[in-house]
Amino acid sequence: MDSLRKMLISVAMLGAGAGVGYALLVIVTPGERRKQEMLKEMPLQDPRSREEAARTQQLLLATLQEAATTQENVAWRKNWMVGGEGGAGGRSP
């Protein structure tokens, strides 16, 4: 009988803890309107940020394409955005 009582108390405590956790989750979760506002404030939502990210992606792709077509080690360049001699004096190690 004592073990049944302990088991019921344990189940009740676990249930109460789960209930409190769920209640806290409901309280701190933003509503639908707040979710929409947060989505609008995200970094890549404005056109300028999207254009900058697209330009960065284009530069990266161009650098990778150039690295694939040349024997020069582009990692030695001081400025990856331009061609020419790098930190190794134009020679590949």
UniProtKB/Swiss-Prot annotation:
Q: Which UniProt keywords apply?
A: ATP synthesis, Disease variant, Membrane, Mitochondrion, Mitochondrion inner membrane, Primary mitochondrial disease, Transmembrane, Transmembrane helix
Which GO-annotated molecular functions does the record name?
Answer: cardiolipin binding; phosphatidic acid binding
Q: Where in the cell is it found?
A: Mitochondrion inner membrane
What ranges does the record give for the region Mediates lipid-binding, renumbered to this chain? 23-80
Reported modifications of this chain? Probably cleaved by OMA1 under mitochondrial stress conditions.
Entry GO terms, CC: cytosol; mitochondrial inner membrane; mitochondrion; nucleoplasm
Q: What is the effect of changing residue 20 to E?
A: In MC3DN9; decreases protein abundance; reduces complex III formation; reduces complex III activity
Q: Which disease is it linked to?
A: Mitochondrial complex III deficiency, nuclear type 9: A form of mitochondrial complex III deficiency, a disorder of the mitochondrial respiratory chain resulting in a highly variable phenotype depending on which tissues are affected. MC3DN9 clinical features include feeding difficulties, hypoglycemia, severe lactic acidosis, and delayed psychomotor development.
Q: What does this protein do?
A: Required for the assembly of the ubiquinol-cytochrome c reductase complex (mitochondrial respiratory chain complex III or cytochrome b-c1 complex), mediating cytochrome b recruitment and probably stabilization within the complex. Thereby, plays an important role in ATP production by mitochondria. Cardiolipin-binding protein, it may also control the cardiolipin composition of mitochondria membranes and their morphology.
Q: What is this protein called?
A: Ubiquinol-cytochrome-c reductase complex assembly factor 3
Source species: Homo sapiens
